């Protein structure tokens, strides 16, 4: 499976992640579709990507784990023999709360999944590419998906918004 352009899409099983996976597939990329609990949706997305003529492999990972970024990168390299050429950090958790009801656990989980792991995943890609070639530049990229909460602040979904 080497010498293919692989894209890792976190949260690639449904909604926007699915659409991103299909767009990459139609553009000729092979897709690593990450999911946490949406295995059925991930399998459907894999079939749609394959129907579009692209390879698609599924990777299951809880991004709230402290070492999720390294584990996910390890999985990708084991499956394809190389780090992905592109990562689309699309996965997130989105749980309702407000400032008075926010808990340390909820804030930490949101921050881990929505901020820490995506940034560490970018670092893991950098380190893998650098290990392989001695340099860390060229044809690799990382895309971080944000939503309207960045510009539309309001008190609902407090932990999500601050993460």
Positions of PLM-derived features:
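A short, exposed helix-loop element centered on a Lys and neighboring polar residues
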Residues: 122-123
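Conserved glycine-rich Rossmann-like NAD(P)H-binding loop of the short-chain dehydrogenase/reductase
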Residues: 29-43
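Substrate-binding pocket helix/loop in short-chain dehydrogenase/reductase
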Residues: 98-111
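Catalytic loop of short-chain dehydrogenase/reductase
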Residues: 134-163
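Conserved glycine-rich cofactor-binding loop
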Residues: 6, 13-14
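Conserved NAD(P)H cofactor-binding loop of Rossmann-fold oxidoreductase domains
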Residues: 90-96
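The beta1-alpha1 cofactor-binding region of Rossmann-like NAD(H)/NADP(H)-dependent oxidoreductases
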Residues: 39, 60-72, 104
């Amino acid at each position: 499976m080497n010498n293919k352009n692989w894209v890792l899409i976190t949260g690639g099983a449904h909604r926007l992640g699915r659409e991103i996976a299909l767009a990459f597939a139609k553009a000729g990329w092979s897709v690593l579709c990450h999911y946490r609990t949406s295995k059925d949706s991930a399998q459907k997305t894999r079939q749609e990507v394959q129907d579009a003529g692209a390879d698609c492999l599924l990777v299951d990972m809880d991004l709230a784990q402290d070492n999720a970024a390294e584990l996910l990168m390890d999985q990708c390299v084991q499956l394809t023999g190389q780090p992905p050429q592109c990562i689309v950090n699309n996965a997130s958790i989105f749980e309702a709360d407000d400032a008075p009801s926010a808990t340390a656990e909820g804030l930490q989980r949101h921050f881990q999944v929505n901020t820490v792991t995506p940034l560490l995943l970018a670092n893991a890609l950098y380190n893998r590419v650098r290990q392989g070639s001695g340099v860390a530049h060229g044809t690799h990229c990382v895309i971080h998906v944000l939503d309207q909460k960045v510009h539309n602040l309001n008190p609902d979904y407090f932990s999500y918004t601050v993460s």
